[in-house]
């Protein structure tokens, strides 16, 4: 819902074209909601007959797996906005005042350089 057939076709084509790639993954969240993602994962597990649901069960049934290392938030906003709620648990965030349409390679490189300097503690 909310995405044109042409765009869906382009997204399917891009997914097919990159299916065999094994390097870095980039996820674009288009028409996405984190609460709905978690709800659908839990409902799927219930439909499969699960009576005790673990974190690992949910992780394996959400849209993206594995968890994200870095979440880049353009636009100057510093909030989750229902974005990757499950996957963001141990992610590092990088905020930019640059709007997404204006986001350039140099902005990405800056985010990656700063991420490289961080001491990730994964909740510890």
Where are the predicted features?
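Flexible, compositionally biased loop and terminal segments
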Residues: 1-124
């Amino acid at each position: 819902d909310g995405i044109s057939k042409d765009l869906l076709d382009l997204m399917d084509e891009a997914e097919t074209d990159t299916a065999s790639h094994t390097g870095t993954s980039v996820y674009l969240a288009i028409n996405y909601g984190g609460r709905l993602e978690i709800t659908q994962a839990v409902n799927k597990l219930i439909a499969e007959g699960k009576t005790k649901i673990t974190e690992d069960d949910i992780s394996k049934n959400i849209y993206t797996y594995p968890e994200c290392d870095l979440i880049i938030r353009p636009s100057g906003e510093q909030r989750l906005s229902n974005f990757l709620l499950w996957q963001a648990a141990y992610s590092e965030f990088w905020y930019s005042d640059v709007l997404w349409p204006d986001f350039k390679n140099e902005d990405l490189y800056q985010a990656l350089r700063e991420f490289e300097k961080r001491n990730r503690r994964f909740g510890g």
